[in-house]
Amino acid sequence: MKWMTRARPKTDRIACPWLIRGFIDPDAAIIYAHADEVIERARAEGARTFDAPGAEFTHRDNKCSFEVLIDEFDLAKDNPALMRLAKIVHAADIAADRGSDPLAAGLEAIGVGGLDVEADDQLLFERATFVYDALYAWCQREVGSRAT
């Protein structure tokens, strides 16, 4: 399936496709488009939309798109590590809640800095996937250590 969002991804627009490929649609084709073209182009291409104005999955009720996807696809069940990651992504993406998680500033810095390092959005996403894989692994360790 095709999934489309706004170009020049950082934080939420990197976290969401990581979540989509890892937990929702492993074969997802992630497409980055100009913000004013996302909805119309997605309709024409039969793509699902996220983290864009008017998108199917976007910020709502003080939740970032990553959290909305987790809720919509019922991914929180039995996955405390994913919920820990969601708190970090939320704190890095939602301006009113910045600073609510100690790891958020680092994730936000990586997201913003990534835009300066890589001009190609697809390559930026592919390169940033490692960061989310590593952070999710840390979250698994973190929640696992609290459970024992």
Q: What annotation goes with each model-predicted range?
A:
Residues M1-R8, W18-T148:
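Extended, well-folded catalytic/binding cores that form a central cleft or groove in large enzyme
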